[in-house]
Each structure stands twice: as structure tokens, then as C-alpha cells.
Amino acid sequence: MADPKYADLPGIARNEPDVYETSDLPEDDQAEFEAELEELTSTSVEHLIINPNAAFEKFKDKRLGTDGVDFSDRISKSRTTGYESGEYEILGEGLGAKETPQQRYQRLQHEVQELIRDVEQIQSAVKESAAEEELTPMALARQLEGLKQQLVSCHLQKLLGPTAAIDFADPEGALAKRLQQQLEVPSVKKAAPAKSPPKAPGPTTDALTFELFWRRPEQDQFSQTAKIAELEKRLAQLEAMVRCEPDSQNPLLVGAEGTSLVETVQILQAKVNILDAAVLDQVEARLQRRPGSKVNEIAKHKAIVQDADTQSKIHQVVYEMMQRWDHMASSLPDVVQRLLTLRDLHEQASRFVQVLVHLDTTQQEVDVVQRLLAEVQKTMKENLAVVEDNFAEVEARIKRLQ
């Protein structure tokens, strides 16, 4: 039974079925709506803003050439032929449209570049022992170079403007030349309307100054290689000063030939440690525990070693080795200290190289930003000129209406 405190409240319907209203879609439509909403708001989907008027003007009075096109679904050895597309738009035959000199110049230059690339591939594939044909790749390359010079000698860039000639082999150089021309335009425009007598040249606030600092990476690599060679030479001199003369009859120097200074010191230190009395007692105790023939054989060798002459020879060898070791021990700390210094120097050089790479990357980014800034400034000047013209026209119309 309902709570009596809600019995006489206004706006409550009595004796009617309960109705629960909601703004949500049915369950079958909710999944589809959520999928569409996720697709519209997803960052993985690229939303293109297309201007239909601009697209219509671009493809206006254009038609698709279907000569030689075959899309039939037949089973045969010959492959079907589709539409051909290239990097540049080329006018088809029989369309009634005629190529402009600028389009023809760009098409010829692009075809010459493609032909040069094909000839270079042929030159790399042809072997020296191949028989010379009527038109060799070398002769074809020379003809292509002459054709390129002839194309450049037409001086179409002066007639068609700076946007006609584009160097496909060096696009960055072409953009740099175009930027230089754009920077020269404001100074020419300011100098043209000057009719008053020339004044003393003063500081120009609108001047743009570009400073480029470039260091050849080959020079850094050459200096680094020279330093490494000098360090290796000094290290070789140190090793030649402290190393001992090779003696094939000396058993203590076995295994120490042809090794570095550090490895030689480690080998000699290990052999000197074997001569310690405590180590010899441990070795003797282990040998005594060896059973059978091994113990007898070691006993025979021990008796030979205990001979006075043999002992004197061993003492003499050890004494001579210790004499040489004194000279090595005196210079060894300096060598170790220099090796540690070389290691620190190599670490500093590696960090310096990383800083140079980061600086080079930052310089490239600054160049790109400066290039974009120049383009934005040019666009803003053009837009400002258009706005001023529009205001002038509006003021003229207002004056005429008055």
C-alpha cells in the first residue's frame, strides 16, 4: 500500500497505468547510434573539409580519356589496362584544350628528369665487358645532358615568371631562390614611387636579415679521427716503453705475448700469486690426496724440481722478472691514470657530438619556422592590400551615393 503522506499531493495521477518516459533510443538503435558517434568523435578518422565550388571549378570542362582502357572481366593471359596517372597533369589528345607554355615547360623538364634516372639505372646495370651497341648508355647520358642544357637555355623562367621553372633535382634550392625573390619585392616596391630628391640612407626597420652558420660534418669527423690516431700513437709508445723482451725459454712469459698491457699485467700477477707459500701448501696438500700413478708422477717431478741447479735457475728467473717488474710497477699507475683520462675524454666527446646533433636539428627547425613566417608575412601583406582596396571601393561608392 502506498505511503499515505503522498495521497493528497497535486499532480499525481490516480487509477492510471504507470508510464516511464526517457529520451534514450530503443536498445536496438542505441548500439548503432553509439557506433556512429564514436566514428564521428574518433581521432583515428580524418575529417576532410572539401569546398564543392572549388572542386567543381577545378574539374570543370574536363573529361576522362578512355582510349586503350580495358576493364573487362575476362580470363586471358593479357592483363587488363586501367587509367594511367602520373606526377603531373598532362592534357589528353582531342580535348580541344591547348597546353600553356608553362605547362609544356614543366612537362618537358619532368620527362627529362625521368629519362636521366632511367639512363642512370641502365648504366649501373650494364657491365664493362658488354659489347657496345649503336647507342650506348654513356652516349645517351651525354645527349640527355645536352638536352637539359638546351631546355635551360630557353630562358623561360624570365618570360613565365619564377613559378614556371622548378628544379626537380633540387627543390630546396628552388624554394630558397623563390624566397629570395619574395624578399626583394618589398624593397623594389618602396623604391619605385620615390619622386622626391634622395635622402641620406637611414636605418630601415623593415629589413630582414638572415644569418646561416654551417659547419661541415667531414671536418669534425676528420679532427676526431686525428685525435684518436694521436692517442693510439701515444699509447703504442707507452706500451713499447714498458713491455718486456720476448723470451721463448722463459715459462713465466708463456701466454703474455701479443696481448695488451693490462692483460699482460693480469697474467703476471696471477703467476706471481701462484708462488705464494700459502698457495703452494694448498697445492701440495691437494696433490698428496691424488691417488695412484698421478701422485708418483708428481713426486718424480718434485724430486727434479728440488735439484739445486734447477732451484737456482728458477730463483734467477724470478729475480730477473721481479727486476723488470719494478720498472713496470713504477710506470703502471701513470698508464692507468692516462687510460682513465682517455675514457673521460671519450665520454665528453660523445656528449659533445650529441649536443651538436641536437643543435643541428634545432637549427633546421628554426629555418623551417623562418620560412613559414616569411610566407605568412607575404600572405598577410597581400590580404591587407586586398582589404585596403575593398575599403577604398566602399568609400568611393559611399561618396557616389552621397
UniProtKB/Swiss-Prot annotation:
- Subcellular location(s) per record: Cytoplasm, Cytoskeleton, Microtubule organizing center, Centrosome; Membrane; Cytoplasm, Cytoskeleton
- Give me the ranges of the annotated region Disordered: 1-26
Q: How does it sit in the bilayer?
A: Peripheral membrane protein
Q: Which InterPro entries match?
A: Dynamitin
Listed A to Z, the keywords are: Coiled coil, Cytoplasm, Cytoskeleton, Dynein, Membrane, Microtubule
Pfam families, sorted: Dynamitin
**What does UniProt give as GO cellular component?**
centrosome; cytoplasm; dynactin complex; dynein complex; membrane; microtubule; vesicle
The entry's protein name is Dynactin subunit 2
Q: Which organism is it from?
A: Gallus gallus (Chicken)
This chain is encoded by the gene named: DCTN2
